[in-house]
Amino acid sequence: MSDPIVPLILSGGSGTRLWPVSRRTWPKPFMRMADGATLLARTLERALAVAAPGAPVLTVTGRDHYFITRDEYAAAAPAAVERHRFLLEPAARNTAPAILLGALDVADRHGGHAIVVVLPADHLIADVDGFARSVHAGAALAAEDWLVAFGVPPDRPETGYGYIRRAGALAHGGFEIERFVEKPDLATAQAYLASGEYLWNAGMFCFRAQALLDAAALACPEVLEAARACHLDTPRDARVIEFAGDSFRAIPEISIDYAVMERAHRRAVVPARFDWNDIGSWTAVSEQATPDARGNRVVGEAVLVDADGCFVQAETRAVALVGVSDLAVIETADALLVAHRDRAQDVKRAVEALRAKAHPSTEHHLTVFRPWGSYTVLEDAPDCKVKRLTVKPGQVLSLQYHHRRSEHWTVVRGTAKVRVGDVETLLERNQGTFIPMGVVHRLENPGSEDLHLIETQCGDYFGEDDIVRLEDVYGRVRG
């Protein structure tokens, strides 16, 4: 096949269904599974398995997730670092804007004949070879200008997924699509399963870039024109492209299913020849762990006494369960979830209640990743806040000051280059400095190993919005 395959990874999420591990700033693609790999890393592995030799892997993600994604890719596939290109969204707008902007980018750089394979970054697929075979079957149909969806043969009457009803058989093991259907009730799902004519809609697609754009011009011209305006409004000569905020937000917020696939004429479905799990609940996560004789599954340190059918994931503390059954217990450093396993889909209701209270556990973990490294909150009191900062070699924090707090820095490991006012000094282990309120300062790691530093803040407000950046190598100074 002469048409090059360009994978388009969609990485994002709101962090509701798998709270407290998944959060707004740390969505599902960054979660680690039982084998220690993140869903994002596994998606990248699949993308590289089907991409044309030397072709880029295009990733659409949020601006706030770029540096984490970049580092995850570098760790997962260091030899492929130069092949990555990123399209950064200033806000989430559902899948149609992301996919149309990706198709416009691919058409510009590789021609409208290039085949785009859309891969959500939060699916678990173990059989990479089977996945690649299915993608190549879909690509063969896409080369004939079909818009291809990948459907998963159902093994149960699932009410949490949309379905695709297949019609007549096509070449390459595909079928024409008769219609897309919404998430059904249980009785309808049972009928779908019994008929053998329905597939789960996996949210994975394959098409020539120009074929999608042509279909969008007919099905949703207003969405395409807004996407095209954003595309033209954005500088595109770099490996990292950040969409202009106003023109991006002008694109209607709609899924690619509603905008294009349900209205298009030449559409096909390829049944998946691989295992598939969208990891959409803690029940799905638990199935990745090995059960004991009583059906309990444990990740982390836990003791279960007279317990049956429970799942425990403990990240920072030992967990003990006594005389209970069918519970999911998820422990993190700052939040604990206890839910009946039959109510796993309702976790998002708890998250909504916490967000209504502006609870920080819905936004971020105690350890927060930044372009330069990370920080972990050790103490958060009304009059002080203590953090442990880890700065990667060669990285530098922004030149900044604060209105409402002073800071004390103490080096625990490594060497720190510190600027306070107009004075620069080098600090070694067990040395420190004081930064008065309102004084410009900067921290840098000039060494070849991680710098570890304890930061003690004193004042009456410690929010991240009390950082006034004057210079920043990561582009975080905005007018």
Describe these PLM feature segments.
Residues 1-9, 16-120, 124-130, 136, ...:
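Conserved N-terminal catalytic core of the sugar/cofactor nucleotidyltransferase
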Residues 363, 446-479:
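Double-stranded beta-helix
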Residues 2-5, 53-55, 81-83, 111-114, ...:
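Short coil/turn connectors at secondary-structure junctions
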Residues 116, 197, 204-205, 277, ...:
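A residue-level structural signature of the nucleotidyltransferase/glycosyltransferase Rossmann-like core
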Residues 2-4, 210-410, 415-433, 441, ...:
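Left-handed beta-helix
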Residues 126-248, 268:
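Conserved core of the sugar-phosphate nucleotidyltransferase
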Residues 30, 86-87, 147-149, 267-269, ...:
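Conserved beta-strand scaffold positions in the cores of enzyme catalytic domains, especially
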